[in-house]
Amino acid sequence: MTYARIQGVGSYIPQQILSNADLEKMVNTTDEWIMQRVGVRERHVIANSPDNTTTMAVDAAKRAIEMAEIDPAVIDMIIVGTATAEYYFPSTACLVQKHLNLREDIPAFDINAACAGFVYALSIADQYIRNEGAKHILVIGVDSLTKVVDWKDRSTCILFGDGAGAVILQAHKEPGILNTILHANGDYSDLITAKSGVWERESVPHLHMYGKEVFKLAVTKLGEIVDEIIEKSGLKQSDIDWLIPHQANLRIIEATAKRLGLPRERVILTIEQHGNTSAASIPLALDAAVRAGKIKRGDTLLLEAFGAGLAWGAALLKL
């Protein structure tokens, strides 16, 4: 049996840091309130730097390729999860292909599942390795949400940061990704929006979110999907070594960990330093944990994410 196994991880965050103290000067908020309600102390932001969605994706990809110790020429697919591409077209994946000088006989495409984008991309890549003969797939989660937040809206501008994370998935005989599950419900599509497209435009595109409703749904749906994927995989909660959640809100993360019976020390948390980096948050957290020596080869990881759409998903894997 062929598995998709993570061979390398990488990430990138902009240099500029926006702290809660900085936000206190911009909107009516406090460090104490943000920490209690969300769990974010600072976030990295593109601001006026030369960084953008593509450059961050490229830098994260380079680091994943370096860790995987592969020749970039062997990469046979690129999948990018993002909701904040530079352009309507070409895709971010094709721009990454260009900057990495990868060969032309490979598919490269973006998928948009907002904050769940990396889990969606990982699931697609897993199927291509299991069923279509792909050997090395570059999967990236990247977003620049600070470019679409309303900096006068204290309920949303405190949440988000920018960044990118990447993994190299490699075909392997040893267990890697065990299962993935993806769900969506468009009936909730108005709960998180950034309405600037071909048919509907805002003069300045801003992210809008009904926070209380999203919080309740996230706790419920993520709780259900982690139970579902553990059962589908024939495992027990006690088999999970690490939870790597989407870093959206510390209280949502704690609710999921409690449902799994996992102590805080077995949950990878970067929300305090990064904020919500959307599709980048899970691979960013994974990269940080691997490079810190927390997560090791053979550990069982549970990934879960929830975002606009509404779309949510989970992945269970052996590193």
Curated annotation (Swiss-Prot):
Its EC number is 2.3.1.180. This is Beta-ketoacyl-[acyl-carrier-protein] synthase III. InterPro entries: ACP_syn_III_C, ACP_syn_III_N, FabH, Thiolase-like. Pathway: Lipid metabolism; fatty acid biosynthesis. The active site is at C115, H246, N276. Pfam families: ACP_syn_III, ACP_syn_III_C. Its main location: cytoplasm. Catalyzes the condensation reaction of fatty acid synthesis by the addition to an acyl acceptor of two carbons from malonyl-ACP. Catalyzes the first condensation reaction which initiates fatty acid synthesis and may therefore play a role in governing the total rate of fatty acid production. Possesses both acetoacetyl-ACP synthase and acetyl transacylase activities. Its substrate specificity determines the biosynthesis of branched-chain and/or straight-chain of fatty acids. It catalyses: malonyl-[ACP] + acetyl-CoA + H(+) = 3-oxobutanoyl-[ACP] + CO2 + CoA. Signal peptide: none annotated. Belongs to the thiolase-like superfamily. FabH family. Keywords: Acyltransferase, Cytoplasm, Fatty acid biosynthesis, Fatty acid metabolism, Lipid biosynthesis, Lipid metabolism, Multifunctional enzyme, Transferase. Residues 247-251 are annotated as: ACP-binding. The last Arg residue of the ACP-binding site is essential for the weak association between ACP/AcpP and FabH. Homodimer. GO terms for cellular component: cytoplasm. It is found in: Cytoplasm. GO terms for molecular function: 3-oxoacyl-[acyl-carrier-protein] synthase activity; beta-ketoacyl-acyl-carrier-protein synthase III activity. GO terms for biological process: fatty acid biosynthetic process.
